[in-house]
């Protein structure tokens, strides 16, 4: 059988539609790639349109065969696992053909790399619950993160319950999407470009106080860089207040009567619609 590639819009529903189409057309796929990652190839390639009804049919089928498989499918799609789409597709094919028993085998090649990636993603989300640093941006709490995996759905319930009475956002630089929360409503939505504005004088002083506190409580004679990087991996430092350079603590200077946009327009809007797709609550 000639190699066949399906291309889709990058959403969870779009991926499920690829699975639906492959069964409807009786085709076995070589690869499934998002339109963002697609590169021209000599192989036969077909673009699959997203149809929510078809996507729901596939997910309901998987969930009816195994609730665990449904959770693995949804969380596996959020990982940074290379070629995750084709691996998840192969898992679904084996589930439909052989049943869910293989899911209990941690060494089965159809599920092991997916479970390994999910464990890594869960660990990353757990660390970020302690490493997220918010700034007060004109009444809105704002933060940025640079995760390997799409962890915003995993962080959603934690921060929405912890800051229930606040308005906040967490921007994922890596995947260019943002978690928005206000007045008991939350959404995860794409945001291609975003840069947090400089703080006002009060926020800058609080940032500096936090950095000084962090530096002061350290016991110089007991410094252990290796231990610190084990418990606080260096790849997270870029978005943590205590590791920023001097420019992070310099307040914005107003020019005339012009108002400074400390937070992007629209974040504090109370009526934020729920976002569909792979960013739905896990």
Where are these regions (language model features)?
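A generic structural motif
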Residues: 30-41, 169-177, 191-192
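Charged, alpha-helical interface segments at or near domain boundaries
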Residues: 33-126
